[in-house]
Every structure is written in structure tokens, then in C-alpha cells.
Amino acid sequence: MSPARTLESSPLPTTQTAIIQGEGGILSIHHNAPLPTLRPDRILVKVAYVAINPCDWKMADRFPTPGCVDGCDFSGTVVALGSDWAKTGRFKIGDRVCGGVHGSNPIDQSTGCFADYVSADAQFTFHVPEYMGMEDAAAVGGTGIGTLGLALKRSLGLPGSPRDPVPESESVQVLVYAASTSVGTLATQLLRMSGHKPIGVCSAKNFDMVKSYGAVKLFDYHSPTCAQDIRAYTKNTLAHILDPITEPKTTELCYAAMGRAGGKYCALEAFAEEFCTRRVVKPELVMGMAILGGRIALDYGYESEADPEKRVFGVSWYEEMQELLDSGRLRNHPVRSFPGGFEGIMKGLHLLKTKQVSGEKLIVQLG
């Protein structure tokens, strides 16, 4: 580890338990893994809870890199400060924090949070407000927040923000596919607080839950007339769509729902070009961890070079999100406590991969 200020009364161990990729990206539990490297710009966090996200199994499945620690969203307690942060006063040892990291990162293999300790970028880590429990804090995490900053502001180009909402005259309708997912309920809140009108697509069984986050209208994707119904409701003028799922059937529905003049389709997964059938619709893939400003060393369209401007935007965005957390305006997704520690994470990953989770965020206690 780099020189850092640590909690002297509790010396850090030399090894930890972590979930790490093996050959072919197969994830397994290791009990003698090294602690993550603490760079000057990072803080070391003793993990209390982790959230399980679809990206956690997808990263290992699609981009197998033996040695990578998996896991993105966490909450925990600061136990060491990188040299850049040791004297700033922004963080101190013992602080309760939450955030998101680029787990299963081929060029930073020790960073994942499915471990006893995680090394987190301090500028993209939140202080947990006093009113919030650590389980809910893990559900907030940071991955979705960063992704939506890039998606709503830079990809869809929406005006306004929760800090500075647009007036009614500038409000636009935004379709959120998979509105009952954690990204969906977060997007719905941010859109509503920014002055816009979030329209959700999800299963009818989750309508009441999504409405409670601010959706103005909901449509059931099971309906054979879902796209036509959306076009009718929006008077054929819909021009902004967010699709966290980005499978062929979701892309088809979103393209069919888009208004006559077209618009922007923001995908959070790589999209198949053959389903992007309308020239007036401009598709774009957003990779959430690009908000950190570093290189994304993946492939299949997810790769990107370092972009310092995204980091500048991201720091400002996270500062605004901290304000929302502190004021209690930002709600986390409904939590489903999942037992079993590291074994529980492995079981939870299987449930997500086999699509057995709906309208809930799986949270596992580690510390």
C-alpha cells in the first residue's frame, strides 16, 4: 500500500476475503487475497454492505480477466486515507461512506468491492447522512448515480438539474424503460426533480412502487400495444428515451415508441445496430464508469479513452447528489436483505443472471 494515514488502534490485515475472477471469468471466494492498493487520490474503506447489480455478473461473463476483484456498490467505514486526502479534512478515519467503483477492471484489478476492503476514488465517494442506515446507503451506492449523470445530462442532453430545475415551459417527456429497476427509480427521481416528466415502462405489478418515485405515467411492457400506447400518450412527440436493459426487444419497443421526428436513444448496454431501424433516432451507449475520467479497458463497444472533461463533470455531479442525500430528497431503491455474506453474494449473482429479481435491490452484509 502507498503511504497513507491509517487507523493506528486497529492495524490493517495483510490479507482479506474477496470474490475474484478465475479462468474464463469464473467468480469464486478467496480468503487470502491481498488488500487493494491505496493510491494517493483514494480512501480505503472497510466494507459493511454491498449491493448486487447486473453489471457484477456481466463484467465477469463478458470480459473475463483472471485476478479481478468483482463488485461495484458498497457502504462502509473509512480506515485509511491516501496522501492526497490525509490533510484536507473532507474525509476522516471512521467516517461512514458509500459509493461505486469499477469492479472487475482489467487495468485496476484490486478495486472491486466484493471484499473486506475497497479502495475508492475519494471524489466519487459519498458521506452517509446520519438519518440513513448503512444497508440503504449500499443501495444508493454510486454506480447508478454516475451512469445517470452521463446519460441524462451528456447523452440525452436534458436541461436543468435537481439543483436548478427547468420551468414547466421547458419540461420534456422522457421515457424510462425498466422503470422498476434501481436505475429506473433513480432516473425517475432525478428527472422529476429536474422539472421533467418521467414516463415509465415496467411490469404492471410494480406500477405503484414506481409511481411513488415520481413517474407521471406508466406502461406495461407485456402489452402488445405498449409502443403504440406510448406514442398516443405522447402525441407522437417523444424525443428522449433511456434504456437500461438494451436487449433487441427493448430496443425495438423504444424505437417504435419514439415520436415521428425522432430523438435520442440512450442505451446502458451495447445495442445491436440491426434493431436501430430509424435514421431520425440517434442511439448512444453510455458506460457509467467513464465518469471517473479514466480509460475503460473493455471491448465490444464499451471501451473508451481517458476523458478528463467527464471527470470534471462527474465531480460537480457527485457534489450535487451529496446535497440531495443530505437533504433526504434522494430515495434508495427498495432493499431486499440477502443473507450469507460472501456465499450470499454468489447466490445473489445467480438470481440476477437468471432474472429472478424484480423491483428490489439485493443487499448483502459483509462487515
Curated annotation (Swiss-Prot):
UniProt entry tagged with the keyword Oxidoreductase: yes
Positions annotated to bind NADP(+): 55-58, 203-206, 221, 268-269, 357-358
Pathway stated in the Swiss-Prot or TrEMBL entry: Mycotoxin biosynthesis
Keyword field: NADP, Nucleotide-binding, Oxidoreductase
Domain of life of the source: Eukaryota
Entry-linked InterPro entries: ADH-like_N, GroES-like_sf, NAD(P)-bd_dom_sf, PKS_ER, Trans-enoyl_RdTase-like
Alphabetical list of Gene3D superfamilies matching this protein: Medium-chain alcohol dehydrogenases, catalytic domain, NAD(P)-binding Rossmann-like Domain
Entry-linked SUPFAM superfamilies: GroES-like (SSF50129), NAD(P)-binding Rossmann-fold domains (SSF51735)
Name of the top EC class for this enzyme: oxidoreductase
Annotated binding of substrate, by residue: 143-150, 288-292
Enzyme Commission designation: 1.-.-.-
Function: Trans-enoyl reductase; part of the gene cluster that mediates the biosynthesis of the cytotoxic leucine-containing cytochalasans, including aspochalasin C, aspochalasin E, TMC-169, flavichalasine F, aspergillin PZ, aspochalasin M and flavichalasine G. The first step in the pathway is catalyzed by the hybrid PKS-NRPS ffsA that utilizes 8 units of malonyl-CoA to iteratively assemble the octaketide chain before addition of L-leucine by the C-terminal NRPS modules. Because ffsA lacks a designated enoylreductase (ER) domain, the required activity is provided the enoyl reductase fssC.
Family the UniProt entry places it in: Belongs to the zinc-containing alcohol dehydrogenase family.
UniProt name for this protein: Trans-enoyl reductase ffsC
Organism: Aspergillus flavipes
